[in-house]
Amino acid sequence: MLSAVAKPRQLASQILNFGLILSTAFMIWKGLSVVSDSSSPIVVVLSGSMEPAFQRGDLLFLWNRNLLQETDVGEIVVYNVRGKDIPIVHRIVRKFGTGPHAKLLTKGDNNAGDDTDLYAQGQDYLERKDIVGSVVGYVPFVGYVTILLTEHPWLKKVMLGLMGVLVVLQRE
């Protein structure tokens, strides 16, 4: 009789713990977004265009609070192209003008040409508002899990299945 009461309580406890983990992760993400002033304070390098500086799968930490200084040539930035939601990590190679309306031209370290072909149609340069953040640190290869899960959707299902089995089999 006692075990029949304990099982729903154990299930409720596991559900609440799972909700706590999700809400904590969300709060940490939003906190980092506010502190760094970036919609994406952490990004994963998706291609080899920035080698040797960054490898595919590196986890980058961004900072977008350049209140007292401008974005400079040589700075590695992450930007989004209008109409696409894939962040691009490249270095600023040219700058025209100063202030918030300065025109910026970017290029991947491992690319032959600049990024004008990557920009939105009719856009020849980036402006400061297009920049998601400047790279201030990184952890090598940690983001490779994200790449694997994106490139192999079946892997997501396997991982979710394994986590489900672990939750069911877990005993306190």
From Swiss-Prot:
Residues 1-14 are cytoplasmic. Keywords: Endoplasmic reticulum, Hydrolase, Membrane, Protease, Signal-anchor, Transmembrane, Transmembrane helix. The active site is at residues 49, 90, 115. The keyword Hydrolase applies. Belongs to the peptidase S26B family. The C-terminal short (CTS) helix is essential for catalytic activity. It may be accommodated as a transmembrane helix in the thinned membrane environment of the complex, similarly to the signal peptide in the complex substrates. This is Signal peptidase complex catalytic subunit SEC11. The gene is SEC11.
